Amino acid sequence: MELFWLEHKKLWRKKIVKICVLLCFVYYVIFGSILLFQWFGFGSSDDYTSAFGNNFDGYTVIKDSQGYALSFGGELTDETLQQIVSDYQQMEADGMEEELEKTDWQIVNSWLGTLYPELRDTSNYKTMISYVDPDKLTGFYERRQQVLDEFLEVSGQVGAEKEYLHQIEGKVEKPFRYEWVEGWSTLLGSMVADLGVVMALFLGIVLSSLFAGEWHDNTSTLVLTTRNGWGKIALAKILTGLAFTVELFALLAVSSVISQLFFMGTAGWDMPIQNIKLIAVAPMNMLQAEIYEYAFVLLGAIGFAGIVMFISAAVKNNVLTLLLSLAVVYGPMMIAEYLPYEMQKALDLIPLVGSSTDIFRTNTFRIFGKLIWSPYLLITIPVLIGILCMPFAIKSWSRRMKA
């Protein structure tokens, strides 16, 4: 334990570590959460002098939007949808531009395009919600089921795979609860989902020198070696890297959740994620989806940390270690679109390469003849990869230093 605390203090004393943590916090929490909620994400859009075309009034807009959505009764039925569309069209006809910003028009418009494509008027420049006849918006859940079936068939997911996905989807409660959706869509679709990509950069910078940096200055390590041995030092470094990973995640996640609670509160936590993407099959509400996404990031970050520390233990050069570490995450992202679909799915199992937004998709893996929904593997395989790398990091470091 003494070795761990020494290594932990040693890591946090580095100026580069403090700078990385500060930059990561500013980028993700200040810009990616607080200012996004208050300004350029949800601020009212009538101030054209602003760099983002938004007023600095996101808190008020969010609260007004939540209150407006609650006026529709809490359940999403044909009548609810008709009322939402009719109300929007009436406000638009009355020129109530400010009031329109309180509506979930982007979400509702995506529902209309998905479920009622025959009502789309290609000659009309307006969005569907502006001109579609509300009385024709019937059979919401029947149409959703039909669209889901058609999507699975077009995707080649038929037979046993289709049945497997239907079994998962069958657990989704209907009718859906309805409150303000746009905030949760932004939160789950980008804010939490992007955390892993952001952490990968700063974890790579900090942890790449954890082992490799000792080749530039061995003094403190040599002193410790006389009493403890390289193996124990390597283990202390591994634990330090894991502790830093968890600490960085906790700092970002807790700060982001506090920001979320301040701006959005808990309203809408029990809505199904199908409100964001109708053909999603996951039987999750918004809160469960958020917990999954944060767990995905934490476990993926631990897995990535294990890989970075293994590379750092095996390579003497700090810069090369950093480049190789970043290539583990960003390399597959850059080449994925040029690869066959099955290979793309395989690359998603690399820590922080896949996306937590797979909970909105119907991707599956077939392992030893058994179908497994992709989110199950995306949250387990990456951390196992990192854990498997850690003993090799210890052995590699000990072997190199003894040589």
Predicted features along the sequence, with ranges:
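Central hydrophobic cores of alpha-helical transmembrane segments
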Residues: 21-25, 319-332, 350-351
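N-terminal Sec/SRP start-transfer signal
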Residues: 1-23
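Residues that define the loop-to-transmembrane-helix transition and helix capping
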Residues: 18, 231, 318-320
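Junction motif at the cytosolic side of a transmembrane helix
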Residues: 5-7, 11, 310-314, 381-403
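Hydrophobic transmembrane alpha-helix segments characteristic of membrane transport
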Residues: 217-221
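Short helix-to-coil transition segments within interhelical loops
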Residues: 224-230
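Short hydrophobic, aromatic-rich alpha-helical segments embedded in or entering the lipid bilayer
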Residues: 343-364
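Secretory targeting signals
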Residues: 26-83, 133-214, 235-314, 318, ...
